[in-house]
């Protein structure tokens, strides 16, 4: 059994998700301020860190992207185990078979993977599915985890 810690990094906050490769399911997740995520790396139990990596797409970038890159470096430095950098176009291609996919397409591909449909994949409070409670950037962290797990 391998546990992946997947990160969708940001310039001030990052989403993290623990993913059990034996069951193919996320076990816990949150979006927290980067300093909290950094200290969490000292206590969280996982076999490998997988991080969505920033890449150049030929467009001008601002300070937020550079700040995110700094945080990625800090996360890697703090983590004392194996890690992989996963690029967003690779996630898109793996989950949707096109690099032109948007976040909504990736989310739907994940729902289809855990479904069929939202009722099974996400569920309701009374009947939660494996993705119940997953919100916002945690979906991106799940996409990174699934892509990394399938590539292993």
Placement of each model-derived feature along the sequence:
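Phosphate- and other anionic-substrate recognition elements at nucleic-acid/protein interfaces
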Residues: 1-152
């Amino acid at each position: 059994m391998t546990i992946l810690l997947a990160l969708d990094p940001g310039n001030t906050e990052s989403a993290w998700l623990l993913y059990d490769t034996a069951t193919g399911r996320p076990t816990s997740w949150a979006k927290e301020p980067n300093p909290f995520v950094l200290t969490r790396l000292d206590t969280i139990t996982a076999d490998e860190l997988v991080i969505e990596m920033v890449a150049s797409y030929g467009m001008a970038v601002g300070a937020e992207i550079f700040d995110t890159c700094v945080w990625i470096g800090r996360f890697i430095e703090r983590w004392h185990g194996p890690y992989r950098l996963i690029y967003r176009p690779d996630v898109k291609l793996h989950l949707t078979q096109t690099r032109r996919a948007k976040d909504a397409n990736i989310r739907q591909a994940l729902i289809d993977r855990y479904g069929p449909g939202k009722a099974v994949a996400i569920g309701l409070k009374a009947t939660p599915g494996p993705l119940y409670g997953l919100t916002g950037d945690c979906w991106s962290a799940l996409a990174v985890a699934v892509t990394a797990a399938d590539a292993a």
